[in-house]
Swiss-Prot record:
Pfam families: Tryp_alpha_amyl. GO terms for biological process: lipid transport. Plant non-specific lipid-transfer proteins transfer phospholipids as well as galactolipids across membranes. May play a role in wax or cutin deposition in the cell walls of expanding epidermal cells and certain secretory tissues. InterPro entries: Bifun_inhib/LTP/seed_sf, Bifunc_inhib/LTP/seed_store, nsLTP2. Belongs to the plant LTP family. PANTHER family: BIFUNCTIONAL INHIBITOR/LIPID-TRANSFER PROTEIN/SEED STORAGE 2S ALBUMIN SUPERFAMILY PROTEIN (PTHR33214), NON-SPECIFIC LIPID TRANSFER PROTEIN GPI-ANCHORED 33 (PTHR33214:SF44). One of its GO terms (molecular function) is lipid binding. This is Non-specific lipid-transfer protein 2. Keywords: Lipid-binding, Transport.
Length: 68
C-alpha cells in the first residue's frame, strides 16, 4: 500500500459535513487503513483523521480507527 492522503479525497465531503459516505470513500479507507497511524501523527492531517465525523465515517465503513 502506498500511503497517500490524496487517495482519501472521496471522503473529504463526509468528513467535513457528516454526510453519508460514498462507496468509493469506504474502499479507499480500507486500502489506506495501514496508513492511518501515520496520518494521525501528521499535524496537518490529524485534525481530519481524528475528527468526530471521520470516526463516524470509519465506523460506517467498518474500518476501526487505530490506537497509535
Amino acid at each position: 500500500v502506498t500511503c497517500s492522503p490524496v487517495q482519501l479525497s472521496p471522503c473529504l465531503g463526509p468528513i467535513n459535513s457528516g454526510a453519508p459516505s460514498p462507496t468509493t470513500c469506504c474502499q479507499k479507507l480500507r486500502e489506506q487503513r495501514p496508513c492511518l497511524c501515520g496520518y494521525l501523527k501528521n499535524p496537518s492531517l490529524r485534525q481530519y483523521v481524528n475528527s468526530p465525523n471521520a470516526r463516524k465515517l470509519a465506523s460506517n465503513c467498518g474500518v476501526p480507527v487505530p490506537q497509535c
